[in-house]
Amino acid sequence: MTQDELKQLVGQAAADYVNATVPEGAVIGVGTGSTANCFIDALAGNKARYRGAVSSSLATTARLQTHGIKVFDLNEIDSLPVYVDGADEIDRSGAMIKGGGGALTREKIVASVSDVFVCIADASKLVETLGTFPLPIEVVPMARTAIGRRVTALGGVPVVRVTKEGVPFITDNGNEIIDVKGLRISDPRTLETHINAWPGVVTVGLFAARGANLCLLGTDTGVETIEYSKG
């Protein structure tokens, strides 16, 4: 299967999982990116079952609204039974690198209040050690250079994310992103805590403190379900 076919496969599997496990009338948390879009498209066929969704980005909001799915502000919602999102990398413990699409902060917020985090990914995203994919850090613009120096001291190579026009990429929150290359992340939870404590960091794209509960992994032989123990 092509990568796009694998994304569609896990998007449908996630919709099937949500339809089978989430009660009618619930509000669902939805992530950002091409794999999350496949989930939205698959979920749309059964949208009447749900009150709506909480979105993690402006792009996801637009996708949901295109399908006629009501989008709620997180402040309006008491609970989210499930959050479904992709990952740039996921390891055997359920820790992830996320933020390739630039929505890491809102993704982390929505994930943090969900009961179950379902990661959907193709098999290429499953790794033994995180770090081959550059680690995104959302930063307040005035702190960009200072954060870059701290990254270098860790042994990483900081690269300011830019648009195709060559100007800094700006997140939905009005901040910039540093992509860190060259890290081998053996202890993602500790590194997440460490980087998040730097002044000027909005959040780092490590999802270890709140990792996935479940991964639906698209392979050439079908969808593999990986469950992670949390505690």
Curated annotation (Swiss-Prot):
Pfam families: Rib_5-P_isom_A. Substrate binds at residues 32-35, 85-88, 98-101, 125. It is an enzyme of class 5 (isomerase). It catalyses: aldehydo-D-ribose 5-phosphate = D-ribulose 5-phosphate. The active site is at residue 107. GO terms for biological process: D-ribose metabolic process; pentose-phosphate shunt, non-oxidative branch. The keyword Isomerase applies. Keywords: Isomerase. GO terms for cellular component: cytosol. Pathway: Carbohydrate degradation; pentose phosphate pathway; D-ribose 5-phosphate from D-ribulose 5-phosphate (non-oxidative stage): step 1/1. GO terms for molecular function: ribose-5-phosphate isomerase activity. The keyword Protein biosynthesis does not apply. Its EC number is 5.3.1.6. Transmembrane segments: none annotated. Belongs to the ribose 5-phosphate isomerase family. Catalyzes the reversible conversion of ribose-5-phosphate to ribulose 5-phosphate. Homodimer. This is Ribose-5-phosphate isomerase A.
